[in-house]
Design a protein with these regions (language model features):
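An extracytoplasmic/periplasmic, membrane-proximal ligand-sensing/linker region
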Residues: 129-130, 134, 154-156, 183-249
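Short helices/loops that flank or line small-molecule/ion binding pockets
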Residues: 78, 82, 97-111, 116, ...
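Ligand-binding "clamshell"
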Residues: 14-28, 85-87, 120-136, 144-161, ...
């Protein structure tokens, strides 16, 4: 038996979210085919073209989000809570396309979501300078965006960096997580993990994905397992701060 679910639920379990009753540590993780690399982008009409201008802005940037538990909302809350960026989060949109349309219509200044889809949604607006990518909320700098600063580098303390990693970066990395049933024999688990990884690195598979404009940016089952374990090892004080930042206010 195999399953795929939104890895953000793992953080939800750590935070004690109602309705998330399964112990995520009991699942066996096969891997992730593509990680989300979250960035924040703003329309030029916002008057903010880079993160330094954002820090200095007396007007909060109006960002669109879907709902709590979705990266569009959670990342906005996390960068506001850890970096102190002025943000007004507007939630209730049904998808990132709705957010894009609202930003293009002037209802929003911008949003934070996966670069893998944001660069397609604004494929003309970004090169034209109508939309500026101002922040990367990622574990490492994206090759496409060498001059865009990372949130981790702007954080002023180890605690802020840990909060960003646990509340924004790790959930995005494991958002499409493949699992199998608990307590399967270790030998079988290793076979499944190797097959999963082999598929995602197969030259023909990668070539077909590229033709279809599908990004392949995998994590192994072992890497996912470590990420999950790290989330469950967070201290009660950090979990409390995460819950406070991500709470609807």
């Amino acid at each position: 038996t195999f399953g795929i679910f939104n890895g953000a639920l793992i953080l939800g379990r750590v935070l004690g979210m109602k309705g998330v009753d399964i112990d995520m540590r009991e699942l066996e993780y096969l891997g992730v085919p593509v990680q989300d690399s979250t960035v924040c982008a703003l329309r030029k009409e916002s008057g903010v073209n880079n993160v330094n201008q954002w820090f200095a802005s007396k007007t909060p940037m109006k960002l669109g989000g879907l709902s709590p538990g979705n990266s569009t909302s959670d990342v906005a809350r996390m960068i506001g809570g850890t970096l102190g960026l002025p943000i007004q989060l507007v939630e209730g949109y049904k998808g990132t396309n709705e957010i894009r349309l609202a930003a293009d219509a002037g209802e929003l200044h911008g949003a934070c979501w996966a670069w893998e889809t944001l660069k397609v949604a604004w494929q003309n607006a970004i090169p034209a300078g109508d939309v500026n990518v101002v922040l990367q909320v990622t574990a490492k700098k994206l090759p496409d965006l060498p001059n865009v600063p990372m949130a981790l580098d702007l954080a002023k303390s180890d605690e802020a960096r840990l909060l960003l990693k646990a509340g924004a970066i790790d959930p995005a990395a494991i958002v499409r997580v493949y699992v199998t049933t608990p307590r399967i024999p270790q030998e079988r688990l290793e076979i499944l993990r190797k097959a999963f990884s082999a598929t995602l690195t197969d030259p023909e598979f990668v070539a077909e994905a590229k033709k279809a404009n599908i990004d392949i940016n995998p994590l192994s089952g072992e890497e996912v397992k470590k990420t999950v374990d790290d989330l469950f090892k967070l201290s009660p004080a950090i979990v409390s701060k995460l819950a406070n930042i991500l709470a609807v206010k």
